[in-house]
Amino acid sequence: MSKTVRWAAAVAGTALVAVLVVGFGIAQASSQDAVASSQLRGACGSKIVVQTDWFPEPEHAALYQLAGTNGSLDAKKGWYTGQIGKTGVNLEIRAGGPFTGFQQPISQMYQDSSITLGYVNSDEAIQLSKKLPTVAIVAPLEFSPQILMWNPQKLNINRFQDIGNSGAKVLVFEGGVWIDYLVTRGWVNKSQIDTSYDGSPTRFVSSDGAIVQQGFATSEPYDYEFNIKQYGKPVKYLMIRSSGYVPYPEPLAATPAVLKAKRACFKLLVPLVQKAQVDYMSKPKPVNEKLVQIVTDLKSFWVESSAGNAWNTKEQRRLGIVQNGPNCTLGDFNQKRMQQVINLLKPIYAAKGLDTYDQNLKAAQMETNAFINPKIGLKTAKCK
């Protein structure tokens, strides 16, 4: 309860406090509930739709924490829906990957007007800032878990430069901007890149890990050793973050039109997302178990386990994937950091002849802390 007191005290209005508290089941119903519920429903409507970029996984846990573990699943569509506390507002979380034909959320957001928010990596937002502009409103993850991995018994790689020297195929999803960055640094050869990756372990397994493949540090190392029996041994990896490439991964973003229309909604919703991530990190098991159930019910190639998801959460914390910013706030944006990424990517896009990005883009155009509650963050030695 002390966490609740710490952040709720800074929120104006007892009705809004009731929304946040009841929304997470921290307190039972009070006389303020009806007012609080009508505030969120009045601002957001009866449903909030979020398009994710992959199968349900612990990196997406803030959303599932917010939707609760008693929701319903449309396994054919990959949509999970749960009510935000007792507010009468449903949160519909849509899986990505094969459920969207491997289209990225940013494309879906411009094709489907029912989508409120989507996961839009900051580098992708920069790349499409002219053609498909978006504004990020909260970042549950501080740094990306993105990795390149391989079988250390097959490839002698210890640093990024070794990837280029190895001559091995580098299997990645199409459209990943970070791979272009590694090419410009001279660490990966363009001829090595294969952008036909679809998330399946088949090619990595069939080559016995003699290729370099993208993944998450919080997922694939465990899965390939323990869940994917055809492989069943450790992988070695390098985190893309360690290359100096540090955009925000999977922040929740809106189109400018939705942002303008939903400001009142986002003012209430964003602190809920922040608090959901804090709550999940302190007690991850219920959501982790639910994620396993959802993925099992989806009946696709993606696999999760209770032990793997528990490991994932610990790795998120150990590797600093989830952490407060330079302050004691979780989910906010550092504009200086983001402007550095913009400046880094502009010459890459110019060299490729892209006309999809805004050449005059500033960090303030693509992210905002306007809805962030600065009092919500993880407890650390620095942040009590």
What are these regions (language model features)?
Residues 35-197, 204, 211:
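Short, glycine-/small- and polar/acidic-enriched structural segments
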Residues 19-41:
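C-terminal region of N-terminal signal peptides and the immediate post-cleavage residues
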Residues 1-15:
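N-terminal export and membrane-targeting signals
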Residues 71-88, 167, 238-245, 260, ...:
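Short, solvent-exposed loop/beta-turn-alpha elements that line the ligand-binding surface or hinge
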Residues 335-384:
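Conserved C-terminal helix/tail region of periplasmic/extracytoplasmic solute-binding proteins
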Residues 142-148, 248-252, 257, 341:
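Small-molecule pocket liners
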Residues 262-352:
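Secondary-structure end/capping motifs
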Residues 123, 197-203, 208-300:
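Pocket-lining segment of extracytoplasmic ligand-binding domains
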